[in-house]
Amino acid sequence: MVTTEEISLKNELIRLLKDVNCVKFGDFTLASGKQSKYYVDIKKATTNPKVLKAAAKLVNYYVSKENNENLKIAGVELGSVSIATAVSLETEKDLLIIRKKAKEYGTKNKIEGELNPGDNVIVMEDVTTTGGSVSKAVDEIRAVSGNVKKIYVIVDRQEGAKENLAQNNVELIPLVTIEELGLNK
Protein backbone atom coordinates (compact mmCIF):
# COMPACT_ATOMS: atom_id res chain seq x y z
CA MET A 1 0.00 0.00 0.00
CA VAL A 2 1.34 3.39 -0.99
CA THR A 3 1.46 5.87 1.87
CA THR A 4 1.36 9.66 1.82
CA GLU A 5 4.93 9.64 3.14
CA GLU A 6 6.11 7.54 0.18
CA ILE A 7 4.25 9.79 -2.28
CA SER A 8 5.75 12.88 -0.69
CA LEU A 9 9.31 11.49 -0.74
CA LYS A 10 8.94 10.34 -4.36
CA ASN A 11 7.45 13.66 -5.52
CA GLU A 12 10.31 15.56 -3.90
CA LEU A 13 12.86 13.39 -5.72
CA ILE A 14 11.05 13.87 -9.05
CA ARG A 15 10.98 17.65 -8.52
CA LEU A 16 14.70 17.74 -7.71
CA LEU A 17 15.60 15.56 -10.72
CA LYS A 18 13.70 17.97 -12.95
CA ASP A 19 15.34 20.96 -11.26
CA VAL A 20 18.84 19.72 -12.13
CA ASN A 21 17.81 19.15 -15.78
CA CYS A 22 19.20 15.65 -15.90
CA VAL A 23 17.30 14.63 -19.05
CA LYS A 24 18.95 15.70 -22.33
CA PHE A 25 17.53 15.31 -25.83
CA GLY A 26 19.47 14.42 -28.99
CA ASP A 27 21.13 11.30 -30.38
CA PHE A 28 22.90 9.23 -27.74
CA THR A 29 24.55 5.83 -27.39
CA LEU A 30 23.82 4.30 -23.98
CA ALA A 31 26.08 2.04 -21.89
CA SER A 32 23.94 -0.87 -23.10
CA GLY A 33 24.88 0.01 -26.69
CA LYS A 34 21.32 1.07 -27.47
CA GLN A 35 20.64 4.26 -29.39
CA SER A 36 18.33 6.78 -27.74
CA LYS A 37 16.75 10.17 -28.45
CA TYR A 38 17.21 11.14 -24.81
CA TYR A 39 19.89 10.68 -22.18
CA VAL A 40 19.55 10.72 -18.42
CA ASP A 41 22.63 12.69 -17.35
CA ILE A 42 22.40 11.23 -13.87
CA LYS A 43 25.75 12.70 -12.79
CA LYS A 44 23.95 16.05 -12.61
CA ALA A 45 21.76 14.41 -9.99
CA THR A 46 24.28 12.25 -8.16
CA THR A 47 26.60 15.18 -7.56
CA ASN A 48 23.79 17.27 -6.08
CA PRO A 49 23.43 16.98 -2.29
CA LYS A 50 19.69 17.65 -2.32
CA VAL A 51 19.05 14.89 -4.85
CA LEU A 52 21.30 12.47 -2.97
CA LYS A 53 19.55 13.23 0.31
CA ALA A 54 16.08 12.83 -1.23
CA ALA A 55 17.04 9.51 -2.85
CA ALA A 56 18.59 8.26 0.40
CA LYS A 57 15.48 9.18 2.38
CA LEU A 58 13.24 7.31 -0.07
CA VAL A 59 15.44 4.20 0.03
CA ASN A 60 15.55 4.39 3.84
CA TYR A 61 11.74 4.56 3.86
CA TYR A 62 11.60 1.28 1.91
CA VAL A 63 14.45 -0.43 3.76
CA SER A 64 13.09 0.44 7.21
CA LYS A 65 10.05 -1.73 6.49
CA GLU A 66 12.15 -4.87 5.93
CA ASN A 67 14.43 -7.21 7.84
CA ASN A 68 17.73 -5.33 8.05
CA GLU A 69 19.84 -8.03 9.66
CA ASN A 70 23.40 -8.10 8.28
CA LEU A 71 22.40 -5.53 5.65
CA LYS A 72 25.03 -3.79 3.52
CA ILE A 73 24.60 -1.05 0.91
CA ALA A 74 26.62 -1.48 -2.30
CA GLY A 75 27.44 0.85 -5.15
CA VAL A 76 29.33 0.17 -8.36
CA GLU A 77 32.22 2.49 -9.15
CA LEU A 78 31.97 5.27 -10.26
CA GLY A 79 28.35 6.16 -10.91
CA SER A 80 26.68 4.60 -7.91
CA VAL A 81 29.21 5.26 -5.16
CA SER A 82 27.80 8.67 -4.19
CA ILE A 83 24.27 7.23 -4.08
CA ALA A 84 25.33 4.21 -2.03
CA THR A 85 27.27 6.48 0.34
CA ALA A 86 24.23 8.72 0.89
CA VAL A 87 22.03 5.66 1.51
CA SER A 88 24.63 4.16 3.85
CA LEU A 89 24.67 7.36 5.88
CA GLU A 90 20.86 7.60 5.97
CA THR A 91 20.31 3.93 6.90
CA GLU A 92 23.45 3.66 9.06
CA LYS A 93 24.34 0.44 7.23
CA ASP A 94 27.86 -0.44 6.08
CA LEU A 95 28.96 0.57 2.60
CA LEU A 96 30.44 -1.68 -0.07
CA ILE A 97 32.07 -0.43 -3.26
CA ILE A 98 32.12 -2.82 -6.19
CA ARG A 99 35.00 -2.20 -8.56
CA LYS A 100 34.57 -2.81 -12.27
CA LYS A 101 37.91 -4.61 -12.18
CA ALA A 102 40.11 -5.72 -9.32
CA LYS A 103 42.89 -3.45 -8.12
CA GLU A 104 46.27 -4.41 -9.53
CA TYR A 105 48.07 -3.52 -6.30
CA GLY A 106 47.69 -3.86 -2.53
CA THR A 107 44.82 -6.17 -1.61
CA LYS A 108 43.73 -6.57 -5.25
CA ASN A 109 40.12 -6.46 -4.03
CA LYS A 110 37.17 -6.21 -6.35
CA ILE A 111 34.83 -5.46 -3.44
CA GLU A 112 35.82 -2.78 -0.93
CA GLY A 113 34.29 -2.90 2.53
CA GLU A 114 33.44 -5.78 4.83
CA LEU A 115 31.31 -8.41 3.10
CA ASN A 116 30.81 -11.66 4.98
CA PRO A 117 29.20 -14.84 3.65
CA GLY A 118 25.46 -14.60 4.20
CA ASP A 119 25.33 -10.80 4.39
CA ASN A 120 22.28 -9.25 2.75
CA VAL A 121 23.19 -6.59 0.21
CA ILE A 122 21.11 -3.90 -1.43
CA VAL A 123 22.75 -2.63 -4.60
CA MET A 124 22.27 1.00 -5.59
CA GLU A 125 22.30 2.05 -9.24
CA ASP A 126 22.01 5.42 -10.91
CA VAL A 127 20.18 4.57 -14.17
CA THR A 128 19.04 1.26 -15.63
CA THR A 129 18.22 0.41 -19.22
CA THR A 130 18.72 -3.34 -19.65
CA GLY A 131 20.30 -4.00 -16.25
CA GLY A 132 23.50 -5.43 -17.71
CA SER A 133 25.96 -3.27 -15.77
CA VAL A 134 24.39 -3.82 -12.36
CA SER A 135 23.92 -7.53 -13.05
CA LYS A 136 27.71 -7.91 -13.07
CA ALA A 137 27.87 -6.39 -9.58
CA VAL A 138 25.24 -8.85 -8.36
CA ASP A 139 27.35 -11.71 -9.71
CA GLU A 140 30.46 -10.37 -7.92
CA ILE A 141 28.63 -10.16 -4.59
CA ARG A 142 27.11 -13.62 -4.98
CA ALA A 143 30.52 -15.06 -5.90
CA VAL A 144 31.64 -14.36 -2.33
CA SER A 145 28.38 -15.66 -0.81
CA GLY A 146 26.60 -12.34 -0.36
CA ASN A 147 22.80 -12.30 -0.81
CA VAL A 148 21.38 -9.79 -3.28
CA LYS A 149 17.61 -9.68 -3.61
CA LYS A 150 17.00 -6.00 -4.43
CA ILE A 151 18.48 -3.23 -6.50
CA TYR A 152 17.30 0.33 -6.01
CA VAL A 153 17.79 2.62 -9.00
CA ILE A 154 17.29 6.37 -9.12
CA VAL A 155 15.87 6.33 -12.68
CA ASP A 156 14.67 3.27 -14.58
CA ARG A 157 14.39 3.88 -18.33
CA GLN A 158 11.85 1.00 -18.44
CA GLU A 159 13.63 -0.82 -21.27
CA GLY A 160 13.89 -4.31 -19.83
CA ALA A 161 16.09 -4.03 -16.73
CA LYS A 162 13.31 -5.06 -14.34
CA GLU A 163 12.51 -8.18 -16.37
CA ASN A 164 16.16 -9.08 -17.04
CA LEU A 165 17.12 -8.78 -13.38
CA ALA A 166 14.07 -10.80 -12.30
CA GLN A 167 15.51 -13.71 -14.32
CA ASN A 168 18.49 -13.53 -11.94
CA ASN A 169 16.18 -13.52 -8.88
CA VAL A 170 16.72 -9.83 -8.20
CA GLU A 171 13.95 -7.27 -7.77
CA LEU A 172 14.58 -3.88 -9.36
CA ILE A 173 12.94 -1.10 -7.40
CA PRO A 174 12.95 2.19 -9.30
CA LEU A 175 12.79 5.29 -7.14
CA VAL A 176 11.57 7.07 -10.28
CA THR A 177 10.65 5.77 -13.72
CA ILE A 178 11.25 7.64 -16.95
CA GLU A 179 7.47 7.96 -17.26
CA GLU A 180 7.31 9.70 -13.88
CA LEU A 181 9.83 12.21 -15.25
CA GLY A 182 7.35 12.94 -18.04
CA LEU A 183 8.82 10.88 -20.89
CA ASN A 184 7.26 7.97 -22.71
CA LYS A 185 9.17 4.69 -22.68
Curated annotation (Swiss-Prot):
<dbReference type="InterPro" id="IPR004467">
    <property type="entry name" value="Or_phspho_trans_dom"/>
</dbReference>
<keyword id="KW-0328">Glycosyltransferase</keyword>
<dbReference type="InterPro" id="IPR023031">
    <property type="entry name" value="OPRT"/>
</dbReference>
<feature type="binding site">
    <location>
        <position position="103"/>
    </location>
    <ligand>
        <name>5-phospho-alpha-D-ribose 1-diphosphate</name>
    </ligand>
</feature>
<comment type="function">
    <text>Catalyzes the transfer of a ribosyl phosphate group from 5-phosphoribose 1-diphosphate to orotate, leading to the formation of orotidine monophosphate (OMP).</text>
</comment>
<comment type="subunit">
    <text>Homodimer.</text>
</comment>
<dbReference type="InterPro" id="IPR000836">
    <property type="entry name" value="PRibTrfase_dom"/>
</dbReference>
<keyword id="KW-0665">Pyrimidine biosynthesis</keyword>
<feature type="binding site" description="in other chain">
    <location>
        <position position="100"/>
    </location>
    <ligand>
        <name>5-phospho-alpha-D-ribose 1-diphosphate</name>
    </ligand>
</feature>
<dbReference type="GO" id="GO:0004588">
    <property type="term" value="F:orotate phosphoribosyltransferase activity"/>
</dbReference>
<keyword id="KW-0808">Transferase</keyword>
<dbReference type="InterPro" id="IPR029057">
    <property type="entry name" value="PRTase-like"/>
</dbReference>
<dbReference type="GO" id="GO:0000287">
    <property type="term" value="F:magnesium ion binding"/>
</dbReference>
<feature type="binding site">
    <location>
        <position position="129"/>
    </location>
    <ligand>
        <name>orotate</name>
    </ligand>
</feature>
<comment type="pathway">
    <text>Pyrimidine metabolism; UMP biosynthesis via de novo pathway; UMP from orotate: step 1/2.</text>
</comment>
<feature type="binding site">
    <location>
        <position position="99"/>
    </location>
    <ligand>
        <name>5-phospho-alpha-D-ribose 1-diphosphate</name>
    </ligand>
</feature>
<feature type="binding site" description="in other chain">
    <location>
        <begin position="125"/>
        <end position="133"/>
    </location>
    <ligand>
        <name>5-phospho-alpha-D-ribose 1-diphosphate</name>
    </ligand>
</feature>
<dbReference type="Pfam" id="PF00156">
    <property type="entry name" value="Pribosyltran"/>
</dbReference>
<keyword id="KW-0460">Magnesium</keyword>
<feature type="binding site">
    <location>
        <position position="157"/>
    </location>
    <ligand>
        <name>orotate</name>
    </ligand>
</feature>
<dbReference type="GO" id="GO:0044205">
    <property type="term" value="P:'de novo' UMP biosynthetic process"/>
</dbReference>
<protein>
    <recommendedName>
        <fullName>Orotate phosphoribosyltransferase</fullName>
        <ecNumber>2.4.2.10</ecNumber>
    </recommendedName>
</protein>
<comment type="similarity">
    <text>Belongs to the purine/pyrimidine phosphoribosyltransferase family. PyrE subfamily.</text>
</comment>
<dbReference type="GO" id="GO:0019856">
    <property type="term" value="P:pyrimidine nucleobase biosynthetic process"/>
</dbReference>
